[in-house]
Amino acid sequence: MLMLLLIIVGLILALIVLGIVIYIVSIYNRFQTLKNGAEATLGQIRVALKKRLDMINQLVEAVKSYASFEKETLTKITELRSSVLKANTAEEIQNIERESRNILGNILVAVENYPELKTSETVKELMDAIKEIEDEIARHRYTYNNIVQEFNTKIDTFPSNIVANLFGFRKMDYLQFEEEIYERPKISF
């Protein structure tokens, strides 16, 4: 009888340990899923930023016969295009975002100064394409920040914070933009 009782207690303890292990594995898997989702979304943002830079480059080509652009601007666009696909952190993405917005802002000023550019079909098409890319970037940024919020909340809450510490998960950075560039560039004709 005592042996049967020990076997039952042993089975109960084994089931409890198995339940805890399964729970830890499920929390770990959720962290991995969120981390991979954030990385994939950053990849989509990188692709969208590269598309934006390609469009900006085409816009510069369309506008430069009217307005003079410094060689530095063209060089900067090329540098940003090559660095965007290498960017691995939210901070690097934010820096590229900020610099490309500054360049786009300068181009928009040039377009405003030359009324004949506003009526150019090529310029209109490029501006429409840039607007679509801006919307795409905004959607990806929203998705990324939602994933990061869930990831960071899990790190802050019990019992998932124990699993996070056990496996070395650290909080992720949100994609945040400076106040003066937070608004999408206004593209209108």
UniProtKB/Swiss-Prot annotation:
Gene: lemA
Lineage: Archaea, Methanobacteriati, Methanobacteriota, Methanomada group, Methanococci
Keyword list, A-Z: Cell membrane, Coiled coil, Membrane, Transmembrane, Transmembrane helix
UniProt record similarity statement: Belongs to the LemA family.
Cellular location(s): Cell membrane
Transmembrane parts of this sequence: 2-22
GO cellular component, one term: plasma membrane
Species this chain originates from: Methanocaldococcus jannaschii (strain ATCC 43067 / DSM 2661 / JAL-1 / JCM 10045 / NBRC 100440)
Name this protein carries in UniProt: Protein LemA
Coiled coil: 87-150
Membrane-topology annotation of the record: Single-pass membrane protein
UniProt xrefs under Pfam families: LemA
Matches recorded under PANTHER family: PROTEIN LEMA
